[in-house]
Amino acid sequence: MSSIKSKTIIEPSENDIEKGEVDFVSSSISNFEEAYEEGPSLKREFKSRHVNMISVAGAIGTGLVIGSGSALLKGGPGSLFIAYLMTGINLYVVLISLGEMAAFSSDDKGFSGFSSRYVDKALGFATGWNYFFKYAIVYPTNLTAVGIVIHYWRPDLNVGIWVAVFLVVILAINLLHVKYFGEVEFWLSAVKILVLVTLIITCIVITSGGTPVHHKIGFHYWRDPGAFAPYLVEGSTGRFLGFWACLVQSCFAYVGSEVVGIAFGEAPNPEKTIRKSSFQSLFRIATFYVIGVFVLGLCVPYDSDILSSNASKGNAAASPFVVAIKLAQIKVMPDVINACLLVFIISSANSDIYIGSRTLYALAKEGYAPKILMLQTKQGIPWVGCLVTSSFGLLAFMNTKSSSATIFGYFSSAVTVFGTINWINILLSYICYHRATIVQQIPTERIPFRSWGQPYIAYASLIFTGLITFFNGYNAFIHGFKYRSFITSYIGIAAYVIMILGWKFTFKAKRVTSSTVDFRK
């Protein structure tokens, strides 16, 4: 689904974008108009508590719990905190923009439906496939991460064994009735919230001196070694690059928060549910992301040898929260956190298939993919889409051999770009939707809710997201040109542009103007 977010670790690459999780993320909602619907619709069997929990914990994944360690190492605690705060504000604008459109016209055609209806059919085509490939790529990396985490306890067993086991288990969960899937995700999300709250409280206790070493830290590490670390070069330029590295990684941690959008398409009473869930997203951002990285920066210095040596590992040792616990000399916790990471990653992989299958369903319903992808079980599960998405999990077996894993690591680094492009699509769709409601003088009573500052904050968010997407590959040009880093940083943008131009030239698609948007219900 939105979210959670993630981004999961495999082989480290030159690309600055972290391969943390991609924990719960997503894509599915759109046109409400019955005239547009062809074939069966997804069943609205998510309960309100399912959607609410997903909106709070959906995108929380290893991008935050593990990936933030690399960002802290590169930028320091000050850069980390500011980056997560800025990206969090930006994400909130994306989510309330999505919420406004979904509350006005919620159904199951996905983000591509919004783009097609309010902007251009070509953009709708590119949006849908961009979003599907994001999850098709990240799913095998999450399966690999499951194997790596279990390898922490059973190093004698090949990672491929666990990849095969969970490939079957996660597919089986996704073929369950949607209400049972919602129940599974509800409890997985509840565990994630409990773990993060525990980690945040633990960091507060550590910085306050309530540990075996009884050392009160406070803001000591913000003064020595400092709040802002130089990255790649020294001086003010290096500190700015450190901040930018944190900004890119924070996008990776946040990407997928739109996950709540897919739940809207299968939720009863969508107008009420969407409004509530959109505002709950602010609570999640403030509590788990911003406060989480703030207390983390109080407990771990960016020049920590333990942080540096563990940054490339894929298990609990790579988590900066574990580094904080080790520095405080608290025993046992690494094993506990490793078990918790397993829950995070399984939830992420679980939602990858859910989101991928619903995205394929939406593409087929819009006419952008074969109609066979709309086939459902009696319980309303798009089983063909589940099988197609799950088949990408076979790529995870590439990671059982180090030579292939390095190549695949570069490929998976492109996930963040696919995610931020989706934010851009949501914002473009919202801006066009907002303009159309004004041009066509849609009565206020027909608009369930409109947030403060629109559409100006949407324009600001669009510029912010565009800059990060375009300059995310900055490190490919420093200290010599790195072609692998360049390719993984910009292949998503190239594919996106090619899909738009290909559809426009093939089908002579014309842009939808504000006066021609169809608002009929």
UniProtKB/Swiss-Prot annotation:
Membrane topology note: Multi-pass membrane protein
InterPro entries named among the record's database cross-references: AA-permease/SLC12A_dom, Amino_acid_permease_CS, APC_YAT
PROSITE patterns: AMINO_ACID_PERMEASE_1
Key words of the record: Amino-acid transport, Membrane, Transmembrane, Transmembrane helix, Transport
Main location (coarse class): membrane
The keyword Lipid biosynthesis appears for this protein: no
Subcellular location: Membrane
GO molecular-function terms, A-Z: amino acid transmembrane transporter activity
One of the record's GO cellular component terms: membrane
Mitochondrion found in the keyword field: no
Membrane-spanning parts: 53-73, 78-98, 158-178, 186-206, 282-302, 336-356, 380-400, 407-427, 487-507
Domain of life, source organism: Eukaryota
Any single GO BP term: amino acid transmembrane transport
Similarity annotation: Belongs to the amino acid-polyamine-organocation (APC) superfamily.
Stated name of the protein: Uncharacterized amino-acid permease C777.04
